[in-house]
Structure formats: structure tokens, C-alpha cells
């Protein structure tokens, strides 16, 4: 089994940033929208200046203007823009020529998810599939039925897109998710303790993931 790409999202302090930068993650996610994990572009800029890392940086936006997204992506040299609101395929198409970043669209798991993936395919580089919880955009800590993960993975791979699975992923559930062979995993609350990223949880998650991958080749 190929090791999935990993994104640690909701980084909200220099300490979080340092832990994630030293981890085995591929992507570090920053939320620029209303959330308990919200940060400012200025904060992220300071962390980037003080901590050297080769991790890719993802900015998460919710119903933000195209102009503001493009400006923040340019100022921070974001590797990825994640559209996590009610953005349309047309919004993603309008954003494309304004940025150098990859564009991902977050979609909620449901009956229409595969159709939405197809609709966004011409305009984005990847997807984040998350649980559908009324009144919440993400960071719920609640998993959806991972039996559908192979369908999402296949559709994304056929279109040459990245696909991350989010919602309810933590050290206790990671093995169950890996059985579905996701190509990407996205975590926020699953590696937090008392609202902060936790080194012990990160280490435990990565140990279990690496072990499963090593015995599944």
C-alpha cells in the first residue's frame, strides 16, 4: 500500500506550527475563516519566517472573495487554496488564472458527492471529502461511512486529482480508514488535546499509519 498524503489542519499557534513542521505530514493547513481555529495571514507569515520547513502550506477559505483569496495566496506563497464553503465550479474557474497555487474543493459526503466531484473536476486540482454535520463546515471529529472511500479515490484518480478524507480521523480510527486505502488524510481535532496540537497524538498516529502501510505492501 502506498502511504497516503497527510494534512494537519487548523494550526493556530507557533507551537502548533513547530510540531506540525517537525512531523511526518505533507501539508500544513491554516483556516482564514470564522472558526475556533481561525488565524490571520500576518500570524502565518511570522511563523513561516521563524520556522524553516519544506511542508506545503494550505489556506482554507469559506465564501471569501476571489480577490482576497488571490491576495492572501500571493502574500503567503500558499501551495494550495482550499475552498471550504459554498463556492461553485465557476468561482474556482475565476480564481484559477489569478493564482499559482493548487485549488482544492471541500465537499461533504453524501448521495451527490460523486456528481459534485465531476462538476468541479475541470476547475480544481483536488478534493477534501468531509462529514456532513448540520451547521458545521469541518473540524467535527465525526467520521462518515468509509466504505465509500474507494469510490471517491477511484473518481479522483481517474481525473488525476488529489483526494483527502477528513472527519473523525485520529490514532484510534486511523487503521480503519487505511483499510479503505485513501490517497490522502486530513486531520484537525484528531491530533489535538485541550485545543492544541499534541505531539504524543501525532507520534502515535504516524506510528500506526506507518506500521499499517509497511505490512500492507
UniProtKB/Swiss-Prot annotation:
It comes from the Bacteria. One of its GO terms (biological process) is L-tryptophan biosynthetic process. It catalyses: N-(5-phospho-beta-D-ribosyl)anthranilate = 1-(2-carboxyphenylamino)-1-deoxy-D-ribulose 5-phosphate. Pathway: Amino-acid biosynthesis; L-tryptophan biosynthesis; L-tryptophan from chorismate: step 3/5. One of its GO terms (molecular function) is phosphoribosylanthranilate isomerase activity. The keyword Transmembrane helix does not apply. Keywords: Amino-acid biosynthesis, Aromatic amino acid biosynthesis, Isomerase, Tryptophan biosynthesis. Its EC number is 5.3.1.24. SUPFAM superfamilies: Ribulose-phoshate binding barrel (SSF51366). Belongs to the TrpF family. This is N-(5'-phosphoribosyl)anthranilate isomerase. The gene is trpF.
Amino acid at each position: 500500500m502506498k502511504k497516503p498524503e497527510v494534512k494537519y489542519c487548523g494550526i493556530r499557534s507557533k507551537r502548533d506550527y513547530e510540531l506540525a513542521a517537525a512531523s511526518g505530514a505533507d501539508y500544513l493547513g491554516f483556516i482564514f475563516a470564522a472558526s475556533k481555529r481561525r488565524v490571520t495571514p500576518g500570524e502565518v507569515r511570522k511563523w513561516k519566517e521563524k520556522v524553516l520547513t519544506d511542508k506545503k502550506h494550505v489556506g482554507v477559505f469559506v465564501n471569501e472573495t476571489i480577490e482576497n483569496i488571490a491576495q492572501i495566496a500571493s502574500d503567503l506563497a500558499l501551495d494550495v487554496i482550499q475552498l471550504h464553503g459554498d463556492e461553485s465550479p465557476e468561482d474556482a474557474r475565476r480564481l484559477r488564472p489569478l493564482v499559482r497555487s493548487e485549488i482544492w474543493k471541500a465537499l461533504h459526503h453524501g448521495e451527490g458527492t460523486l456528481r459534485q466531484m465531476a462538476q468541479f473536476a475541470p476547475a480544481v486540482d483536488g478534493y477534501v471529502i468531509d462529514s456532513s454535520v448540520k451547521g458545521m463546515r469541518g473540524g467535527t471529529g465525526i467520521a462518515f461511512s468509509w466504505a465509500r472511500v474507494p469510490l471517491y479515490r477511484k473518481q479522483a484518480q481517474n481525473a488525476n486529482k488529489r483526494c483527502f478524507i477528513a472527519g473523525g480521523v485520529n490514532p484510534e480510527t486511523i487503521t480503519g480508514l487505511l483499510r479503505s486505502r485513501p490517497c490522502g488524510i486530513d486531520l484537525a481535532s484528531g491530533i489535538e488535546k485541550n485545543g492544541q496540537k499534541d505531539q504524543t497524538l501525532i507520534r502515535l498516529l504516524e506510528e500506526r499509519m506507518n506500521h499499517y502501510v509497511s505490512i500492507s505492501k
